[in-house]
Amino acid sequence: MLRIPVRKALVGLSKSPKGCVRTTATAASNLIEVFVDGQSVMVEPGTTVLQACEKVGMQIPRFCYHERLSVAGNCRMCLVEIEKAPKVVAACAMPVMKGWNILTNSEKSKKAREGVMEFLLANHPLDCPICDQGGECDLQDQSMMFGNDRSRFLEGKRAVEDKNIGPLVKTIMTRCIQCTRCIRFASEIAGVDDLGTTGRGNDMQVGTYIEKMFMSELSGNIIDICPVGALTSKPYAFTARPWETRKTESIDVMDAVGSNIVVSTRTGEVMRILPRMHEDINEEWISDKTRFAYDGLKRQRLTEPMIRNEKGLLTYTSWEDALSRVAGMLQSFQGKDVAAIAGGLVDAEALVALKDLLNRVDSDTLCTEEVFPTAGAGTDLRSNYLLNTTIAGVEEADVVLLVGTNPRFEVPLFNARIRKSWLHNDLKVALIGSPVDLTYRYDHLGDSPKILQDIASGSHPFSQVLKEAKKPMVVLGSSALQRNDGAAILAAVSSIAQKIRMTSGVTGDWKVMNILHRIASQVAALDLGYKPGVEAIRKNPPKVLFLLGADGGCITRQDLPKDCFIIYQGHHGDVGAPIADVILPGAAYTEKSATYVNTEGRAQQTKVAVTPPGLAREDWKIIRALSEIAGITLPYDTLDQVRNRLEEVSPNLVRYDDIEGANYFQQANELSKLVNQQLLADPLVPPQLTIKDFYMTDSISRASQTMAKCVKAVTEGAQAVEEPSIC
């Protein structure tokens, strides 16, 4: 099997600067001059010919080269002529030398590319009309621009057996040109050595050697980086052509990272979801749940208002009847008799509208499903509940301590950043919690929360590692805060972070304390003053309970009085809707322009890609209409006015794609000393231990047939998933 060794043993890679692992930063005086088609350009020593050409805007054709992967140099499509050199060179792998004149469009360069393209097409099936890559295929584009206009190959073409690597990625291996991008992505970015090559020459094949599922939460990205149609999306197969779809730039809400995405739609239906570049968040990758769970947007949807009748059955009704029923209850009960719970997929506009509505009936019992300790600093200080170092900041860290989290399946793109830094920057990682299968080596310190006390006191050996670190990070998973001793865990982590700042070489602007959230709405809800957890509702059960997309099962009918009136507003008939007396159908994230705040405190917007199904409406509009019928009209009629209200309550919520720094760690640590709670002996066990736990975590992914197939393939094998035969 071909393997690209990219471990720290590679000299030079570990010292590479952020963003590009193949160039070496030098002083300006050390720049060297080269010429590209006679045009002068100053570059750093070690820059490749291809990078020098791109610096002057000259695009060199390539198949195997990718900016975020190691150099393979095996497709030879990037051959260029160097003046006075005896042979053409591979631009992606050849470092420039002073005074070189690179000829990108000489006759020798053109002839070399034509020859390479002719060899690549010799065994290619040329089945573009039935290939899902058609219209966005590098092989199509480059054969058009750099290939010959006819073929001299008259022999029989080879055929390669397709591989079954799971329900997400479709393989047509006869189209494969052995660029090895997928292999390098799996080994370097995903950290899963499942893919490789067997055979040599004409018999070379890319595959898993033993037929098995490609076990990665980032597997769908090999579809994007494949330059031909060898790897395509199984759920998307034969459904649309790229020029038929409308593309909408948006963000993902399946986790708390806020990955930037492109939603492709046709005839009012989401056809597929692709990644969008954002260097500070997801780079150009997205998780499989982000990419493939979109079919859950078409199933189990709430499309019309519903009311529970005298027989106890939910029946369809009109908006007027449903809103009048809810308004009547709000007029009958006020104050502590009215409460609300916000779920994990709720946007900031709906959160502020619901807050204003309940405040107008003299209620402040607004809760989130996720628990966050309120003892000590609680949620009063914003730096106490953010990933303060930022996602991209991981690349600057030299030590990371993970506490009670499995970032690989809770927040895959954050985990990919940790692996990137571990691979190239000698990052040292340690974990307190259940041992999990991460994509990098780490020191397992144990699973007892009491280890935190030992580290804080300095008696644990790892205390010295943190003390010697220049840029340490302590990352506490939000799942650990759901425990009964969550406040004590938070206080212990805060103490560790503050002692590191005082005793190590940490500079003033480096932030050690970090909270890693799992759901998209939590940070915005805390910014708006929602109470974390539903304990207040359990202690004082209300007469009217508003469930805003609350499908986490944090509260049941048994927790409430029999006469409690429950309103569910959301987009899926999942956990919350069956217990409701009135259902108000809302819009999903692809159907509204809405604000979400990710785990690092960065506000971003989703955009309208399709209209909500049936009679469903945007959440803030439903709440606004309800307030008018109830006689407590909210003072906004448009989205801009709602966002003005957001700005009044929490200005950072409308500073899009910007992170407002928070630095109250010393104050938070002082307040944490007031926490009167003991750490329990129970081990720290994150809820998502294996990849099986990754696929179905919210109302959208639980409604997805594709995600259900993934769970079945993981538990029973890829062969257990029956795929429809397409002729």
From Swiss-Prot:
Binding residue positions for [4Fe-4S] cluster 2: 176, 179, 182, 226
Molecular function terms from GO: 2 iron, 2 sulfur cluster binding; 4 iron, 4 sulfur cluster binding; metal ion binding; NADH dehydrogenase (ubiquinone) activity
A Gene Ontology biological process term: mitochondrial respiratory chain complex I assembly
Residues where [2Fe-2S] cluster binds: 64, 75, 78, 92
Sites bearing N6-acetyllysine, chain numbering: 84, 467, 499, 709
Residue span(s) of domain 4Fe-4S Mo/W bis-MGD-type: 245-301
Cofactors required: [2Fe-2S] cluster; [4Fe-4S] cluster
Ranges for domain 2Fe-2S ferredoxin-type: 30-108
Record key words, sorted: 2Fe-2S, 4Fe-4S, Acetylation, Electron transport, Iron, Iron-sulfur, Membrane, Metal-binding, Mitochondrion, Mitochondrion inner membrane, NAD, Oxidoreductase, Respiratory chain, Transit peptide, Translocase, Transport, Ubiquinone
Membrane topology: Peripheral membrane protein
Taxonomy, superkingdom: Eukaryota
UniProt family annotation: Belongs to the complex I 75 kDa subunit family.
Subunit structure of this chain's protein: Core subunit of respiratory chain NADH dehydrogenase (Complex I) which is composed of 45 different subunits. This is the largest subunit of complex I and it is a component of the iron-sulfur (IP) fragment of the enzyme. Complex I associates with ubiquinol-cytochrome reductase complex (Complex III) to form supercomplexes. Interacts with MDM2 and AKAP1.
PANTHER family assigned: NADH-UBIQUINONE OXIDOREDUCTASE 75 KDA SUBUNIT, MITOCHONDRIAL, RESPIRATORY NITRATE REDUCTASE
Protein name listed in UniProt: NADH-ubiquinone oxidoreductase 75 kDa subunit, mitochondrial
Gene this chain is encoded by: NDUFS1
